[in-house]
Amino acid sequence: MTELVFILDRSGSMSGLEADTIGGFNSMIARQKQAAGEALVSTVLFDNDSTVIHDRLPLSEVPPLTEKEYFTRGCTALLDAVGGAIHHIGNIHKYARREDVPEKTLFIITTDGYENASCRYNYETVRRMIQRQKEKYGWEFLFLGANIDAAREAARFGIGADRSVNYKCDEAGTALNYEVISEAVCSVRAARPLSADWKRRIDEDVQKRGR
């Protein structure tokens, strides 16, 4: 069993990429439904606020994302989205029977801008939370950022440069993002180590087309 947590930016700066984000996410989920193994899916959409649209749903029961859920507005309260999700999933694991705790937990964080609106969590708190979950429980975190220095921003969250990548925030870049995310999720679900070149295709795209 794998715990999958998607933290998706829907702030105002994502305007114009709604259809690409929805299509990319749905294609990724469809591919995961064809892969072997069980998974639980949580999806958090964030702008000024965080909205949980899937709360540990069995993968087979995850409905398609639509424009009713994914629409752009507001600012970027990324720390609140990440901190709230870690707290929620961590508490469930803490009080669950050992046999009910998923063997693997993977967070995928996608943002096209810097944090600018959180009021419940700060960098230090979230960094400590992430470091604890990585070191004590082996959780994995991937950070995909556009229009920012993704490695530097990920470091502020306690996520290493090898788990962060800059992507091109356009139609092609968004589609590629979800293809690469799907490949990474497949590796984690198959209990294969996430290789250092998991992000190679995104890096090559940015080198070719720029940020």
Model regions and ranges:
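Acidic, low-complexity intrinsically disordered regions
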Residues: 1-211
